[in-house]
Design a protein with these regions (language model features):
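Residue in the alpha/beta-hydrolase core beta-strand immediately N-terminal to the catalytic nucleophile
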Residues: 54, 90, 114-117
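Helix-loop "lid/cap" segments that line or gate small-molecule binding pockets
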Residues: 143-147, 157-167
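Short beta-strand immediately N-terminal to the catalytic nucleophile in serine-hydrolase-like folds
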Residues: 73, 91-93, 119
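Flexible "cap/lid" loop of the alpha/beta hydrolase fold
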Residues: 99-150
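Catalytic nucleophile serine of serine hydrolases
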Residues: 54, 61, 95-96, 120
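Conserved HGGG/HGGXW glycine-rich cap/lid loop of the alpha/beta-hydrolase fold
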Residues: 6-66, 80
């Protein structure tokens, strides 16, 4: 199985199908790259190179104790793009993957990315502020972040059902 090594030593899983112009699929929170199986098969059959990536704490990637912040996630994406030598890349994203892609572009530039597709992306601002009075209070985010730092894989396991299992 193909893995890359992140800057902090975490082993991050990726899958590669087809040949041609590259498409990198970034999944939503709590999902693995397998969520893209149907899309990967269809695009690979149409002559594209399709790469699925399991972010840290997801799928077959390591579940390290730390590194569950947006900058680390996007640095992991940058490591994958660099290691695979990807250029003229199309990023296809879902939910949190959209936030990763936008942060990637602001941190690492757009030289290697030619297209960005955002599917049901996370909103750019969830925190309550003067500019976003309908947002959530900071205390809620701080409690969530503390849980993530303590044991992100456990948080995902405990909270994934509402996303996929109807009541």
């Amino acid at each position: 199985m193909p893995f890359i090594t992140a800057r902090d030593g975490a082993q991050l899983y990726w899958r590669d199908f087809g040949q041609g112009a590259p498409i990198l699929f970034l999944n939503g929170l709590g999902c693995s790259s397998q969520m893209w199986d149907y899309q990967i098969a269809a695009f690979a059959d149409q002559g594209f190179r399709c790469i699925g990536f399991d972010r840290r704490g997801h799928g077959r990637s390591d579940q390290p104790a730390g590194g569950y912040d947006l900058d680390t996630f996007t640095d992991d994406v940058a490591t994958l793009i660099d290691e695979l030598g990807l250029a003229s890349l199309t990023l296809v994203t879902h939910s949190m993957g959209g936030g990763e892609a936008v942060r990637y572009l602001t941190r690492h530039g757009s030289e290697r990315v030619s297209r960005l597709i955002l599917l049901a992306p996370t909103t750019p601002m969830l925190l309550k502020s003067d500019d976003n009075p309908g947002g959530a209070p900071r205390a809620g985010f701080e409690a969530l972040w503390a849980q993530w730092r303590r044991d992100y894989p456990k948080w995902v396991a405990d909270n994934i059902a509402p996303f996929f299992i109807p009541e």
